[in-house]
Amino acid sequence: MFSRQFGRLATLALALAVAGCAGGEQSTTAEAPSEPAPVAKPDVVSAATGELSNFSTADLKQAKKLFQAECGRCHVGGQTYGTYNSTDVSLSYDALTNATPPRNTVAGLVDYMKKPTSYDGRTDLLKTGEHASFTGLGDEKLRLIAGHIIKEATSNPNWGQGKDTR
C-alpha cells in the first residue's frame, strides 16, 4: 500500500517539477532536441521478454528471492559492486547484449553462471577467482535467476544503470 502511495506522490511531484520548468511561459516554437533519442531494438528486446512467458508469477517471485540470496551481494539493482575484483560490468540489457558471447537470453545467462568469463569472453573468471561458481544450484535455479535478470533488464529502467540508483 505504501509503495503504491509513494509511486503516486512521486509521479505527482515529477509532473509538478516538469510544469515548473516552463517558468509560467508557454513556448510557441518547437526546439530541436540536443541529442537524438535512443533507438530501441524492439526485435531483440521482444525476443528476450518473450522468453518470460515461460515463467509463471510464482516462478518470478522465487527467481527474485534466489537472485537476492545468490547474486544480490554483488549485483544490487543489476549493478556490479566490485566484489571479486570485478570490472564493474552491469547487468543492464545493453551490457548483456554486447557481451561476448551475448548474455541477453536465459540460455546465455545460465551458460555464464556455469562458466563465467570476462566481458570479452577471453578469461575464465572461475580460474582467476573473479566470480563465484553457481554449478551447485542446478539448472532449474539457474534458469529462474536468469529469468529474473531478463525481467529486470527489460522492464526496470534503473536496472544496471549505476551505483547511485539503489
UniProtKB/Swiss-Prot annotation:
Residues that bind heme c: 71, 74-75
Ranges in a coiled coil: none
Pfam family name, one: Cytochrom_C550
Cleavable signal peptide: 1-32
Keyword Glycoprotein applies: no
InterPro entries for this protein: Cyt_c-like_dom, Cyt_c-like_dom_sf, Cytochrom_C550, PsbV_cyt_c550-like
GO molecular function terms attached to this record: electron transfer activity; heme binding; iron ion binding
Biological processes per GO annotation: photosynthesis; respiratory electron transport chain
Alphabetical UniProt keywords: Cell inner membrane, Cell membrane, Electron transport, Heme, Iron, Membrane, Metal-binding, Photosynthesis, Photosystem II, Signal, Transport
Membrane topology: Peripheral membrane protein
Top-rank taxon, per record: Bacteria
Localization, UniProt: Cell inner membrane
Cofactor remark: Binds 1 heme c group covalently per subunit.
Cofactor or coenzyme needed: heme c
Listed GO CC annotations: photosystem II; plasma membrane
Protein purpose: Probable low-potential cytochrome c, might function in photosystem II (PSII).
Family: Belongs to the cytochrome c family. PsbV subfamily.
Protein name, per record: Cytochrome c-550 2
